[in-house]
């Protein structure tokens, strides 16, 4: 039987291929249920994934439509694909440092939307700086819901996990982890990010950085939101 992940993939492909364009109406829950022969809950779960990826939006009185596309879709192989495929955490000459794990209240609108939480809800944040041949290239920030951390104990203390968290989560729970579409956008770097990337810029100078993000789900909803902040000119890992 088709599941929510397959339904999300079907519509994601239609949106990215241009078969569905910004402003186009999505099938109603009932229409999509009939189309795929599934119950309404499965369709809602699939639509929630697409909403978390910024691909569709729901508005009172207007139903669900395809969203505008300010983000760039990242294609090809990324660090997570490499880890799943080869078991290698790092590419040649790559490592990471500054691993930290902390409990915090979430206020970032993008994180709250992706994880379907309210501003101020408690999350677990894992931070590390990736380096290529000793030079910082990106800051990795992973935001986890508390239920995720309960199942993946390797998040404790140093924040180093033995393997991909999705595999660990599946081993502990039996639930499959679905990785959403990775997208990118530009924004201004925080001072902490400037320091971690060792950018030599005058104090208080605005620095534009490329930010990629992806959200993970299981059958019960969002699990984690991962963000990588790249130094200007840095190459996104693709092997």
Predicted regions located by residue number:
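HTH-adjacent hinge/linker in prokaryotic transcriptional regulators
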Residues: 2-8, 34-35, 42-122, 149-161, ...
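Short helix->loop/beta-hairpin flanking segments within DNA-binding domains
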Residues: 6-24
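A short alpha-helical element within helix-turn-helix/winged-helix DNA-binding domains
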Residues: 18, 23-36
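Generic short beta-strand segments
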Residues: 102-106, 127-129, 212-215
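Catalytic-core "active-site belt" of small-molecule-metabolizing enzymes
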Residues: 108-120, 125, 129-143
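C-terminal regulatory/effector modules of DNA-binding transcriptional regulators
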Residues: 117-118, 135, 146-239
């Amino acid at each position: 039987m088709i599941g929510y992940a397959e339904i999300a993939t079907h519509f994601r492909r239609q949106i990215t291929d241009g078969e569905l364009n910004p402003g186009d109406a999505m099938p109603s829950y009932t229409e999509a249920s009939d189309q795929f022969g599934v119950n309404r809950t499965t369709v809602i779960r699939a639509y929630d994934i697409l909403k978390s990826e910024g691909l569709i939006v729901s508005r009172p009185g207007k139903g669900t439509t395809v969203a505008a596309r300010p983000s760039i879709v990242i294609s090809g192989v990324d660090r997570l694909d490499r880890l799943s495929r080869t078991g290698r955490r790092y590419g040649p000459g790559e490592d990471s440092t500054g691993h930290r794990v902390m409990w915090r209240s979430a206020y970032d609108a993008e994180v709250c939307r992706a994880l379907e939480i309210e501003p101020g809800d408690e999350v677990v944040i894992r931070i590390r700086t990736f380096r290529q041949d000793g030079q910082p290239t990106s800051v990795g920030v992973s935001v986890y819901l508390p239920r995720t951390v309960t199942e993946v104990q390797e998040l404790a203390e140093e924040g180093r996990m033995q393997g991909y968290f999705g595999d660990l989560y599946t081993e502990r729970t039996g639930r499959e982890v679905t990785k959403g579409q990775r997208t990118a956008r530009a924004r201004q770097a925080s001072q902490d990010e400037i320091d971690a990337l060792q950018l030599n810029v005058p104090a208080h100078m605005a620095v534009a950085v490329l930010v990629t993000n992806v959200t993970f789900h299981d059958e019960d909803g969002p699990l984690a939101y991962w963000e990588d902040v790249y130094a200007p000119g840095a190459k996104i890992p693709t092997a």
